[in-house]
């Protein structure tokens, strides 16, 4: 199928739970991509975690052939995208390979902030956006209201939005027909020198690096000698093909097509995402504009429970970074936890998922320290340093000013929950920037400290709005704030992994609740364990985990009191000696207790 006019590259934009993966299943079924026996729910969510949590994390691609009502056969290249706010960079990568996007909106729930953000990304990249109303067979569906919401909030014409139900398969053919009519065919010269963009890469234990590519011009065949523009190393192509969703070798990919390429690259960083592939003979071909590098928002220390796992842990992180370009890591050592890595993530969900993938796919046992954001610190001599780890904060005497990152949060919610959401934003030290009433919905714009947003703001927003509010946020600037480091001392020793950077106004309260939390989590020892929270040299809170003690006077029946006193004194002296040499084991829960401190 060499005719470019018969190729359509598209992706689906939707909020979590609006039926994106189910719609993809129906497309595959309708176009006969898999036999009825191989078909299963959420075919494209290939990771166990994706299935269990019901979310899409990685972008996947499928090539289907569809015979339209007019009898023409079209090749549909469909790239699945995630919907959660933490994975928005995956979306922008997928969209770069498409000419069109389906904006899927739940006809019962209406438009949500995340789909608005992704939709604007698509429009900025010049894609044709087609609104689709899903779940119209639900009794509570209101397609007219939702169509007018799409027009009010996003500003694209939704009068003739396609209506379908991905679950029952109703209207799927209409969606495909509109897709063929509205999405432009790709442009590209098959005879020009090869130019292909790497959308995604992952590591296969047998094949090495497998890359998902979009060919913009020329064609890519097996046995071709190729180079990657940023690295310049030549490789020979072993395998070229498409996913139907199973891997299918075709031997050739032409301009406008999306498929995979395997070139026997064994180095983990051998095929960076966003790089350009070309033939070794035409190495002067210009590099395609890649993707903007995403900056991690949340940093946490990850440490293997047993130090023997350190090497495996490093390899596992390398393989994950190939598959997930936004993960950042560098080696770190902690007095309390030994050697590990400081990792950067896009948000809390991203962090949980990376930890879960490391534990499942690579069989590691990990301890995570409390996540922090990155702070800008100006020292007295005028130099500026960035701190992503509280224990690396310079001495308070040398600091002229500390600045915390501020994000702009866009929230959409029904009017009934406006009051509760505003109260939550004020608690989180937010500043209101804008408020608009759009039909039955309200769009709120707030500036909030990132530290307040990334930890538990999303969960709290969902609970105060009974799940109806949605959130999208992006970093705006660093702003000066009164920040201090809160240290936790256990038996007068600082535990570096438990340090926190907090706002001065809430430091005392946080210190007290953190010390109380620790008291619950640290098991009782044979001696008293003093837990203190301190700012600099000033202790702001203290609790004690009382010692377990044996009843040494149980064997004394009656008799002289001095005998009992002697035994009690002896026990006391023993405990004192024990306290000098005894070490307190801190359980994993205690490191994460920092998260549970209600601010």
Swiss-Prot record:
The record gives the membrane topology as: Peripheral membrane protein
HAMAP family in the record: LepA
Per the UniProt record, the source organism is: Saccharophagus degradans (strain 2-40 / ATCC 43961 / DSM 17024)
Q: Does the keyword GTP-binding feature in the UniProt annotation? A: yes
What compartments host this protein? Answer: Cell inner membrane
> Which residues does the record give as GTP binding sites?
17-22, 134-137
In the UniProt record, the gene name given for this protein reads lepA
Q: Which PANTHER family match?
A: TRANSLATION FACTOR GUF1 HOMOLOG, CHLOROPLASTIC, TRANSLATION FACTOR GUF1-RELATED
Where does the tr-type G domain lie? 5-187
What's one Pfam family the UniProt record gives for this protein? EFG_C
Matching entries from InterPro entries are given as: EF-4, EFG_III/V, EFG_V-like, G_TR_CS, LepA_C_sf, LepA_CTD, LepA_IV, P-loop_NTPase
Q: What is this protein called?
A: Elongation factor 4
The record's listing under CDD domains reads:
EF4_II (cd03699), EF4_III (cd16260), LepA (cd01890), lepA_C (cd03709)
Reaction it catalyzes:
GTP + H2O = GDP + phosphate + H(+)
One example of a Gene Ontology biological process annotation: positive regulation of translation
Q: Name one GO cellular component term.
A: plasma membrane
Transmembrane residue ranges: none
Question: EC?
Answer: 3.6.5.n1
Query: What family does the Swiss-Prot or TrEMBL record give for this protein?
Result: Belongs to the TRAFAC class translation factor GTPase superfamily. Classic translation factor GTPase family. LepA subfamily.
- Location, primary (coarse class): membrane
Q: Which UniProt keywords apply?
A: Cell inner membrane, Cell membrane, GTP-binding, Hydrolase, Membrane, Nucleotide-binding, Protein biosynthesis
Q: Which GO terms describe its molecular function?
A: GTP binding; GTPase activity; guanosine tetraphosphate binding; ribosome binding; translation elongation factor activity
What is this protein's function per UniProt?
A: Required for accurate and efficient protein synthesis under certain stress conditions. May act as a fidelity factor of the translation reaction, by catalyzing a one-codon backward translocation of tRNAs on improperly translocated ribosomes. Back-translocation proceeds from a post-translocation (POST) complex to a pre-translocation (PRE) complex, thus giving elongation factor G a second chance to translocate the tRNAs correctly. Binds to ribosomes in a GTP-dependent manner.
